[in-house]
């Protein structure tokens, strides 16, 4: 743990994606006749990032196949329940690798979701290392995620935003093809450790109830697979639809199948309907890797 160092902010990673996304979305808001699709939104982000000298390629991952040629949303149009959000911005004030734009990211994204998507301040939890909000420690971040999904019900839409450093740690569970877990780096990472993708998956992703929607924006290094989801769209200018991620761990899919069955209270047919397409692709890809 002590050997991990925050990356040099000159690496031009912190906050770039949030800014690019908001630029694209506010441009669309100012031209209401032009509804952006997921593809247009992510490719618009990529163009803005490249124009500013950034190398990131925006990605969308999902627990199910999403038609990326449909309109982009943070809260789905059919949302009938409560809209909640957890927004985290860490500048690592006073530490090596200090960032400067993550607090602004949170303030800007908060204004956007309230102004455009109808989120109410009372349902927005903010964690920032500014001395005014709840400190973004490891414990506080995980608690915020756990509280968010604990309160979610059918018809609700929740949004999580993280702007800060991301990292990698050696995988100890054997579920990562590249041998590394992607991580979020909390303020107290030296004392408490980083937050692994497995932690996020277990406390956040698997706890979302049936009929509710969770959308996350992770603006940090190594964030492409930090939620450990099976479907992926990469805005590289060549893809036009979401694909099954062949690096996805088959065990996670089995867990999702079990979760679906639990949600439907033993209704195996309903559970199978949720995961059958994913299972078919996952098993095929997994067998190809195992027996090639």
PLM feature spans:
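Cysteine endopeptidase catalytic domains of the caspase/legumain-like
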Residues: 1-292
């Amino acid at each position: 743990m002590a050997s991990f160092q925050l990356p040099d902010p000159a690496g031009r990673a912190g906050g770039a994606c949030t800014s690019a996304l908001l630029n694209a979305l506010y441009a669309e808001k100012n031209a209401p006749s032009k509804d952006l699709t997921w593809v247009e939104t992510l490719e618009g982000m990529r163009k803005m990032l490249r124009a500013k000298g950034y190398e990131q390629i925006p990605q969308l991952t999902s627990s199910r196949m999403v038609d990326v040629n449909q309109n982009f949303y943070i809260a789905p149009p059919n949302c009938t329940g409560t809209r909640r959000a957890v927004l985290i911005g860490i500048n690592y004030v006073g530490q090596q690798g200090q960032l400067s734009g993550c607090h602004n990211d949170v303030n800007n994204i908060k204004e956007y979701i309230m102004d455009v998507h109808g989120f109410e301040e009372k349902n927005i939890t903010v964690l920032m290392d500014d001395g005014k909000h709840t400190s973004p420690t490891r414990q506080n971040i995980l608690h915020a995620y756990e509280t968010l999904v604990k309160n979610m019900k059918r018809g609700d839409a929740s949004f999580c935003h993280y702007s800060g450093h991301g990292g990698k740690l050696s995988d100890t569970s054997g579920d990562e093809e590249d041998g590394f877990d992607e991580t979020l780096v909390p303020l107290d990472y030296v004392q408490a450790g980083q937050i692994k993708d497995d932690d996020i998956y277990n406390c956040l992703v698997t706890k979302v109830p049936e009929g509710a929607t969770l959308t996350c924006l992770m603006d940090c290094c190594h964030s492409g697979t930090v939620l450990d989801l099976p479907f992926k769209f990469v805005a590289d200018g060549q893809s036009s639809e979401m694909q099954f991620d062949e690096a996805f761990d088959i065990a996670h899919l089995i867990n999702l199948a079990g979760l679906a069955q639990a949600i439907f209270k033993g209704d195996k047919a309903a559970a199978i309907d949720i995961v059958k397409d994913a299972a078919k692709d996952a098993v095929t890809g997994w067998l190809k890797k195992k027996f090639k």
